[in-house]
């Protein structure tokens, strides 16, 4: 079942329509809602800063994951160089993923989507969206994307241990890198229909609205912004911001301005 609508952009007249009022599973058209909400509510120049702190053991470091799911090899090289300037020897690299809450997969996601290359478990730091063996495309994704970031940084530093950890209060910052600006990330998300990036951008929106960085918080934030901007989201029930969920429902009016 599908619904659709064609509108004359000059007159606003509807020239064709099918099931405009019917609630349907939106699939990737959900990203239209996500992009609209993020564009309306966030600064297009906003960047995500990933910081690294000295650990409780002076030869350990802890990455504070902040939501950059498209980290690059170059960023890890940069972090390693900065850390080496501050710490002579690093034995362990750990990563703190507490910035995001809740389950790593949304209600209605097919567990096979990770191995199928459509999405990774949502953790607030990933290398190239959790892709395995390459930087682009629908290739199998890691089941432990944040831990992979710690391992990759550890390899660059000659560390013998990598794992999950927490940044201690008043810990010393030893390195940081910034993501691309939101405008670039949103553009790439739409161009490639990138599910991981869509979910990550929605987490930024949730935090900006004082909500929890989780599937529940970010879907609430998306609909809240759209409602404030005059979109008809009455009856819309989305479980994610990428459209992978099989139990999300929306209608055509929500996509109209």
Q: For the regions a protein language model found, what residue spans apply to each?
A:
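Short active-site loop at a secondary-structure junction
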Residues: 17-33, 37, 42-45
